Amino acid sequence: ARRWVTDLSGDRVGVPYVKPGDEGFVRTDIRFSHEYVTPMAAIFWRDFVGAAEKVVDPGSIFFFRDHLTFLELAMTDARKAEGLLDVALELKKKQEEFAEEQGITLYGELPRTARNSIVQGSEAICHSKMLERHVLPGQVVIGSDSHTPHSGAVGCVAFGVGNADAM
């Protein structure tokens, strides 16, 4: 396994192989982010890359709204009165806007219905959906979720990153 990782990593960095202590940027196959991190990454993108710039290969990027989906049901009235729900809903809005601007797939919330106006759930849980539908053996995958290495079950290299690294 170590040989496979060093060979794969070398290929992604642009050298025959890597050894302990080497540094470089790794070319990924898939990137994904959830609603806590996407808005921060969008702000970094706008401020440091440029609002008019487009991400490279938006088809390989996926956004998820799965951590705060039921917040309006779970949050106490006292916390709502403090404005915390409004702040959380801004994260949702920012994520939706950035996905739209960049042409990135967003797994959002299930639609509300006329009969039931409350949140019905999320379209997907990020680390599960990636494993079920998107990742393939031999790929390099990064995600903003702590369960990102879950995708390694199919023989890919998958690891979690922070918001600045996600884009």
Model-derived regions: residue spans:
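Fe-S-dependent hydro-lyases/dehydratases of central metabolism
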Residues: 1-167
